[in-house]
């Protein structure tokens, strides 16, 4: 059942990336980044649409050349999810994609150039009502900051960020968010904690270059979990050396585990032992695949025996407590007369979950429409 998160979020200003609100209490936005060649318009559009299908609120696209900028124009015309253009080295690319309707510009202080170039980007962003992300990265700090600190430190990342925040402040430009990413969990966490005390703008969270699907997910969950539990963060990206689809799934799983934002089914499943009366692992894996299209938040417990099965089912939207041959079925915490054959749990439970999700979605829509 739904339990409110005890987390009190950091107060920040509000910006919009396309039609997606960021900060000031808005839902924490989950984003990913394409890994196709941007000049391959068809492949990039296909990947963006696939990311949107699994819940991406925002998608970032690398724009390394003017040819990529021209491709970005065509891409933007074919997708509906807000796009962030990732700009490094050549500030003129930012000016070009601004003409093509980009929803946000990500610039890297470590390589975008001098203050005059930054001012050109800011002026263009203001004229076109485009927000900016100041994206600091521990692996690409400015040379003078590298020389000063010798190695990436939280203070070094903070100095880089504040240097560019100050430029935007002097230009009276407040439509921006900031990130201070590092591949080390403690370095990233310390950097964000320092930054959160210095500015009121929204913060984009991430553990950069976190690694492969398994290790990177764990590293991201630890780092972002610490920050989110402290109320820090307004948007996030999980950086994995894996299919970008996994980044969105992991991002929502982290938010779901902290009760911050839910999307789809939250499966509560036991790790199994010799007491299990049905194949829990196979059941969970099959249901996760079959039901990944659902977006209605629901808790479903799948426990293989009667030790913890009834207790978990009583606090879930639906639950199975394993029993000999036929397992007990619960809905809204109440044990039902119907029992599920242990060899046919997946099919029957899928049908019940889909029906329940449709009902909850309809009820939620009615509640929204009744709000003045």
Curated annotation (Swiss-Prot):
<dbReference type="InterPro" id="IPR045854">
    <property type="entry name" value="NO2/SO3_Rdtase_4Fe4S_sf"/>
</dbReference>
<dbReference type="InterPro" id="IPR036849">
    <property type="entry name" value="Enolase-like_C_sf"/>
</dbReference>
<dbReference type="GO" id="GO:0016114">
    <property type="term" value="P:terpenoid biosynthetic process"/>
</dbReference>
<dbReference type="InterPro" id="IPR004588">
    <property type="entry name" value="IspG_bac-typ"/>
</dbReference>
<keyword id="KW-0560">Oxidoreductase</keyword>
<keyword id="KW-0479">Metal-binding</keyword>
<dbReference type="GO" id="GO:0046429">
    <property type="term" value="F:4-hydroxy-3-methylbut-2-en-1-yl diphosphate synthase activity (ferredoxin)"/>
</dbReference>
<dbReference type="InterPro" id="IPR016425">
    <property type="entry name" value="IspG_bac"/>
</dbReference>
<protein>
    <recommendedName>
        <fullName>4-hydroxy-3-methylbut-2-en-1-yl diphosphate synthase (flavodoxin)</fullName>
        <ecNumber>1.17.7.3</ecNumber>
    </recommendedName>
</protein>
<keyword id="KW-0411">Iron-sulfur</keyword>
<feature type="binding site">
    <location>
        <position position="273"/>
    </location>
    <ligand>
        <name>[4Fe-4S] cluster</name>
    </ligand>
</feature>
<dbReference type="GO" id="GO:0019288">
    <property type="term" value="P:isopentenyl diphosphate biosynthetic process, methylerythritol 4-phosphate pathway"/>
</dbReference>
<dbReference type="GO" id="GO:0005506">
    <property type="term" value="F:iron ion binding"/>
</dbReference>
<comment type="function">
    <text>Converts 2C-methyl-D-erythritol 2,4-cyclodiphosphate (ME-2,4cPP) into 1-hydroxy-2-methyl-2-(E)-butenyl 4-diphosphate.</text>
</comment>
<dbReference type="Pfam" id="PF04551">
    <property type="entry name" value="GcpE"/>
</dbReference>
<dbReference type="InterPro" id="IPR011005">
    <property type="entry name" value="Dihydropteroate_synth-like_sf"/>
</dbReference>
<feature type="binding site">
    <location>
        <position position="312"/>
    </location>
    <ligand>
        <name>[4Fe-4S] cluster</name>
    </ligand>
</feature>
<dbReference type="GO" id="GO:0141197">
    <property type="term" value="F:4-hydroxy-3-methylbut-2-enyl-diphosphate synthase activity (flavodoxin)"/>
</dbReference>
<comment type="pathway">
    <text>Isoprenoid biosynthesis; isopentenyl diphosphate biosynthesis via DXP pathway; isopentenyl diphosphate from 1-deoxy-D-xylulose 5-phosphate: step 5/6.</text>
</comment>
<dbReference type="GO" id="GO:0051539">
    <property type="term" value="F:4 iron, 4 sulfur cluster binding"/>
</dbReference>
<feature type="binding site">
    <location>
        <position position="270"/>
    </location>
    <ligand>
        <name>[4Fe-4S] cluster</name>
    </ligand>
</feature>
<keyword id="KW-0004">4Fe-4S</keyword>
<keyword id="KW-0408">Iron</keyword>
<feature type="binding site">
    <location>
        <position position="305"/>
    </location>
    <ligand>
        <name>[4Fe-4S] cluster</name>
    </ligand>
</feature>
<comment type="similarity">
    <text>Belongs to the IspG family.</text>
</comment>
<keyword id="KW-0414">Isoprene biosynthesis</keyword>
